[in-house]
């Protein structure tokens, strides 16, 4: 896929986010923010037998953070929690499909950070 198609997909996820909202009685919930640009993300998961059966996010911020959250929530439904623990920066960059500069990298990685903190059961992200 060309960079233009990836950019279109990112813009579409930003303008029409998937899985945005809240779940009724989520099994996992975590919230965090990026103080440098004001992005905020809350991730909620429903889990059965160690598998994500539903996922949602809520928050606000730049196009990259919100689109990444939307794309990530779609991708993780049906995956085992143990697999989510192994997701990394490269996974997010592959998901986005375009080069992300250093300034926007924290924006792109915030949804993953929030997801992994929730899956690992952290009360707060270690500084």
State each model region's role:
Residues 68-79:
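Alpha-helical support elements that line or immediately flank enzyme active sites
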Residues 50-51, 55-62:
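A short interface-forming secondary-structure element
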Residues 37, 59-67:
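Short, thiol/selenol-centered motifs that function as redox-active sites or metal-ligating centers
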Residues 64-69, 107-110:
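Catalytic-loop motifs flanking and including active-site residues across diverse enzymes
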């Amino acid at each position: 896929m060309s960079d233009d198609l990836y950019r279109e997909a990112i813009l579409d996820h930003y303008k029409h986010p998937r899985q945005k909202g809240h779940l009724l009685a989520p099994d996992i919930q975590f919230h965090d923010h990026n103080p440098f640009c004001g992005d905020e993300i809350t991730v909620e998961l429903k889990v059965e037998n160690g598998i994500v059966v539903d996922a949602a996010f809520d928050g606000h911020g730049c196009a990259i953070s919100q689109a990444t959250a939307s794309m990530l929530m779609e991708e993780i439904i049906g995956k085992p929690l143990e697999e989510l623990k192994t997701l990394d920066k490269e996974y997010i960059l592959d998901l986005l499909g375009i080069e992300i500069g250093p300034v926007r990298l924290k924006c792109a990685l915030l949804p993953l950070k929030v997801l992994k903190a929730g899956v690992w059961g952290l009360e707060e992200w270690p500084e």
